[in-house]
Amino acid sequence: ETKRLRFQVEKVLQMSMFERQKATLKMKEIDANELISGVINTFALKVERYNGKITSNLEATDPVIFADEMHITNVIFNLMDNAVKYKKPEEDLELKVRTWNESGKLMISIQDNGIGIKKENLKKIFEKFYRVHTGNLHDVKGFGLGLAYVRKIILDHKGTIRAESDLNVGTKFIIALPLLKNN
């Protein structure tokens, strides 16, 4: 299931990044808490394989957004997949996923205890084809499109995304999306 989803994510990444225009979005009403729960369930086995654990705190009382289900699923999957890819080899992975409401928006955060990102690299991580050099620490495959895709999809949904990170402590991605009622 995880492999199938990764293949789908890669395929969508390749397609959408080489189209200059907005991704074609099939917008509909979505309960983001439900969608995120689904991704967490799909991902749980993979995280357990690394002796990791996912804790979720889906506290948004209004989780309803107007969004493209496949693309938002890919965004959540991609950020969680990065947490696995960039985990510390000597430490069990801890993944914290949270939703809440703040000033008319749905907020989503995905936090890990991985290798983290240097401050000077942080502003570049959303650029197309940019990859942080991690040495030979990880068997990380890909095109450096993941976060560029994530950012593009969030922006196409009139949202924002930012990252906070401390080297050797971990990374936290924070997404803000407009609620359906405010869209």
What are these regions (language model features)?
Residues 1-5:
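Short alpha-helical segment of the dimerization/phosphotransfer core of two-component systems
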Residues 20-25, 64-67:
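Conserved micro-motifs of the catalytic ATP-binding
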Residues 26-31, 48, 53-63:
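Conserved catalytic submotifs in the C-terminal HATPase_c
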Residues 83-84:
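Short helix-loop "hinge" at the ATP-lid/N-box region of the Bergerat-fold HATPase_c
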Residues 92-104:
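Short beta-strand/loop element within the Bergerat-fold HATPase_c
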Residues 117-129:
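Short conserved segment of the HATPase_c
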